[in-house]
């Protein structure tokens, strides 16, 4: 089964106009623009990074829309990765010059990992079993951010 944003029937790419992120009104465009990543969690939930519309949407495995997180202030939704814990509690999302940390189930934005002067345009994200983040950048190779635990 194919589906578009909000679980809508997708339309041909030629008719999906890219709308400036500054013009968004809630809930946003009814179709995806550039789907830059799709990830399926262990519980079967599907997460879609719609880069040009600067949002992440979650769906059931049969295409029913569940939630959306849009961050229109900066470049958002370049890539997606799950935390390695059994529940995959966190969703990591490429965000401007860092990585947004999001509660996976609620899609609540928690914060951004953005070490000073280290990250460029993070384009692909992956985690390992220890919680380390690996970030491939468009202009500066790859970096590993070592997991040292959660802080307040």
Q: What are these model-predicted stretches?
A:
Residues 1-17, 66-71, 110-114:
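Beta-propeller fold detector
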Residues 51, 95-96, 138-139:
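Short loop/turn segments immediately following the C-termini of beta-strands
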Residues 60-64, 103-107, 146-150:
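Short loop/turn segments that connect beta-strands within beta-propeller blades
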């Amino acid at each position: 089964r194919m589906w578009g944003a909000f679980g809508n029937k997708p339309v041909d790419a030629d008719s999906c106009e890219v709308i400036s992120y500054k013009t968004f009104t809630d809930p946003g465009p009814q179709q995806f623009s550039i789907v830059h990543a799709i990830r399926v969690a262990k519980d079967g939930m599907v997460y879609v990074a719609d880069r040009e519309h600067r949002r992440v949407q979650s769906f059931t495995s049969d295409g029913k829309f569940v939630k959306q997180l849009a961050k229109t202030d900066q470049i958002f939704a370049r890539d997606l990765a799950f935390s390695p814990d059994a529940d995959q509690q966190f969703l990591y999302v490429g965000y401007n010059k860092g990585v947004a940390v999001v509660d996976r189930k609620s899609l609540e934005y928690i914060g951004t990992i953005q070490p000073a002067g280290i990250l460029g345009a993070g384009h692909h994200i992956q985690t390992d079993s220890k919680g380390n983040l690996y970030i491939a950048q468009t202009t500066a190779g790859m970096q590993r951010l070592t997991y040292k635990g959660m802080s307040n």
